[in-house]
């Protein structure tokens, strides 16, 4: 989000963060799988419902890299997420893709997501998208 918007419209920041949390909670609920696939299909072309379903919910053998958890929904900047940001920043600097070794402090502002979570009595990570049995896949 742009710094000027953050400074000028904290109400928009809060609304945006609440909408993002609602979206991630919706995604984490397996009861919404059919609706998620419908939304994805409406935004893409050339993919069957089954292919879209498998991309998010499909079960794959461990020998092929399959895991129970398909997507971790951190929502906020957890210690794990912070570590990934720091690692990515160091890598991008090492290949001269960016010109700073560390991001400036205001580049990552966890306070907004943290405030929304506190207001809702929640903690990050907020959920996961887990693999589902093949029997639940669209035909």
Briefly describe each language-model feature range.
Residues 1-11:
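A bilobed periplasmic-binding-protein/Venus flytrap-type ligand-binding module shared by bacterial periplasmic
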Residues 9-100:
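Secondary-structure end/capping motifs
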């Amino acid at each position: 989000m742009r710094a000027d918007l953050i400074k000028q419209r904290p109400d928009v920041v809060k609304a945006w963060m609440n909408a993002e949390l609602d979206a991630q909670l919706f995604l984490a609920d397996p009861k919404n799988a059919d609706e998620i696939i419908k939304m994805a299909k409406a935004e893409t072309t050339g993919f069957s419902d089954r292919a879209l379903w498998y991309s998010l919910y499909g079960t794959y053998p461990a020998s092929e890299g399959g895991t129970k958890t398909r997507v971790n929904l951190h929502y906020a900047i957890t210690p794990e997420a912070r570590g990934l940001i720091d690692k990515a920043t160091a890598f991008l600097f090492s290949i001269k893709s960016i010109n700073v070794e560390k991001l400036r402090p205001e580049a990552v502002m966890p306070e907004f997501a943290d405030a929304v979570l506190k207001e809702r009595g929640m903690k990050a990570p907020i959920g996961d998208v887990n693999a589902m049995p093949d029997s639940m896949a669209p035909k």
